[in-house]
């Protein structure tokens, strides 16, 4: 897939370590691309689960993917503030069909009041055994949890209110063209 440009719509696919498709988002709008990162927005985006169930995202969400970090970030813009869902995942890669990454189960959720919660630790441990995650992979993921927490605590990138506001404003401008 050639690098998408601002205003393009792309498909995002998450996989599990064993190569099975986990979840697909249709029509994510690209807001910015750089050599290493893609910023987009999901707003009433169709999501298809691996079992065929479908649902639509409820609110606008700024999505951040990077080629060097082992996480991606979803900033969900709600009436009472921004909440975040962070997936520990492989750096993204793209082909002619979609932006793709491997989801490694561990998640961090940040609520609008700032509360942070690690999620799915048991699922990660179960899949680590079942899918034979290497010690190196386990180390990388745990180190990137530390990097992610430093970003959260320091309001870096997507965790800055200004960042969310800038990209949401750009989305509204593109949507209303």
Curated annotation (Swiss-Prot):
Keywords, alphabetical: Hydrolase, Magnesium, Metal-binding
Coiled coil: none
Binding residues annotated for Mg(2+) 2, in chain numbering: 105, 107, 120, 123
Cofactors, names only: Mg(2+)
GO terms for MF: magnesium ion binding; nucleoside diphosphate phosphatase activity; ribonucleoside triphosphate phosphatase activity
Active site residues according to the UniProt entry: 23
Catalyses which reaction(s): a ribonucleoside 5'-triphosphate + H2O = a ribonucleoside 5'-diphosphate + phosphate + H(+); a ribonucleoside 5'-diphosphate + H2O = a ribonucleoside 5'-phosphate + phosphate + H(+)
InterPro entries per record: DUF402 (IPR007295), FomD-like_sf (IPR035930), Ntdp-like (IPR050212), SA1684 (IPR016882)
EC number: 3.6.1.15, 3.6.1.6
Binding sites annotated in the UniProt record for Mg(2+) 1: 87, 103, 107
Residue intervals passing through the bilayer: none
Function per UniProt: Has nucleoside phosphatase activity towards nucleoside triphosphates and nucleoside diphosphates.
Similarity comment text for this entry: Belongs to the Ntdp family.
Name of the protein in its database record: Nucleoside triphosphate/diphosphate phosphatase
Native source organism of the sequence: Streptococcus pneumoniae serotype 19F (strain G54)
